[in-house]
Every structure is written in C-alpha cells, then in structure tokens.
Amino acid sequence: MGQFSSPLAGSLNSIGQNFLPSQTIETAQANRYQNTALGEVEYSFSRRSAFTLSGAYGILHFTTPGYISSHMVSTQAGYDYQLDAKNSVAVLASYARIDYTGTASPTEGYAAELAYGRKITGQLAFQVSAGPEETSASRPGTGGFRNLTLAANSALTYERRRSGLLVSYSRGLTGGSGVFIGAISNTFSGTLHHQFSRYWSGSVNGGYAFNSSLVPTGVAATTFTNWFVGANAGRRLGRHAQLAFNYGLQKQDNPAVCPVVVGCFATGFQQSFGATLNWHLRAVE
C-alpha cells in the first residue's frame, strides 16, 4: 500500500505499511492464522503526476484461547509528483479501522503524510514520509479517547545486479499483535540479499521493534521490546519449485505484568529453525 507511483516506485515502497495486520510482539506458543488482501488502482494525469487509491483487508485470528483476534479494513489515497529524474514528492491520506473479536471496542486511525523520495544514484535510493496521526479508541470502563501522534516511514535501498540492501523504519498504529487492543509500533529493520548462482540465493536480516499499548494521554503505557536477527538460504528446484532453509534468533523484553492471562513470550534468547517448499504454477524466473 501507499507506494510512490513515479519511476522511483520500484525501490521506494515502504510508505503506509502500518495499516496492515502485524505481529511485532511475540506470544507464547499459540496457533493462529493471518491473511491479507490488497488492491490498488492508479490514474496518471501526465508522465510526472499520478493519483493512487489502495485498500486492504486483513485478519489475525488465534485458535488458541486467551489472545486477541482482530480484523482490519484500511484505505489510502495519494498524489505523487515527479519533480525531475531523481526527485519525487507525494501527499498521502490514510484511514484504518480495527475491530476485535468478542469486544465492542474498535480502534480507528487517520493519518496525513508528506513524502519525499530521491534516487541518489542508479543503485541507491531514499524515501521518507511523516505527518500527524489521530487515533480514536473505545475501551470498556474508560469510555472513548483520542490521541494525536506521529506517523512516519523511511527506507534506504541499494541494489546491484546480484545483491541488495534495504534499511527501513516505520512508526504508527497497529493492531496489537494479539496482546494489545491497539498499539503504537516503532520498527527498525534491515535486509541484505545475494544471488550466489542461478540456483542458490541467500539473505540475512535483523531489526528492533518497540510497541506500546494504546492508552489515553497521560496514562502510562505497557511496552514490549523485541530484537531479532535471521538468515535464509534458498535453492531453485527445476522451473517450478523452490526450497528454503531459515534460522532466527530473537530476544523480547516483556512488561512486569503480561497483558494476556495465557502468558507472554519467554524472556531471554529464543531460536527457531525452519524449511519451506514452494511450488509455482508459472515457471520461476
């Protein structure tokens, strides 16, 4: 959602990612499923300007009792103008509504952002957007409240023929990862990828997430912090299949009192290993 529609769009694509279901807070062992449907239309007024309208619907549903399931509807409109071959500006407006299963406590967010993107060289590009975000929420026992905060996104990308680097930051309203009824999330992340050969590829990634509960102004928020690193190696199998192996290491700092009765993610370092096999109807390029 919310991408620049100018020629920079290929590398400048992190604007507006907050209005999607996210899980930057780890839970204890629990079964869940998450799905997102996205759509986008664009109308070009000229070679240098365009209007983009996008929408999304996402669900985060826990089959393990005790966590907060949610579904989100969001939309974003943006006008993008290419100043020259290297610089673009955009005006973005976003809206999201999050409903939580079993409660009558929806959360809504309205954001307006100014965005700037620059193609520094043929391989290096940068983008940033920022603006006010108003969140409104209703909570049993406390009634409704409104907060005004900052929404922001930025990304730096570097791409070569066989390698690439992405460093990004985002801040804004999120669903709460099944632990909070709404949260303000700050996420820093970086990914480095490389194509070793026609068949083998790999990547490493890392980041930091800081999440705080959505509460009225003046009330102390509950917070989680999460550090994570990972690595992935993949191999193409023929023209239609890919096999990948991955490893993750993370550490989460929990609040003194866990917000959900079923318990929070274990403190200290946690490791994960996995393998995936993907098959595509179309031949893999």
Which residues make up each language-model segment?
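Transmembrane beta-strands of outer-membrane beta-barrel pores
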Residues: 1-3, 57-61, 95-99, 108, ...
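Residue-level signature of outer-membrane beta-barrel architecture
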Residues: 41-43, 81, 118, 156-160, ...
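Transmembrane beta-strands of outer-membrane beta-barrel proteins
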Residues: 1, 51-53, 89-91, 126-128, ...
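Outer-membrane beta-barrel channels and translocator barrels
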Residues: 46-48, 82-86, 119-123, 160-163, ...
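Extracytoplasmic loops and strand-loop junctions of Gram-negative outer membrane beta-barrel proteins
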Residues: 17-25, 59-63, 96-100, 135-139, ...
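Hydrophobic, lipid-facing positions within transmembrane beta-strands of outer-membrane proteins
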Residues: 33-39, 73-77, 89, 93, ...
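Outer-membrane beta-barrel "beta-signal"
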Residues: 233, 240-242, 246, 268-285
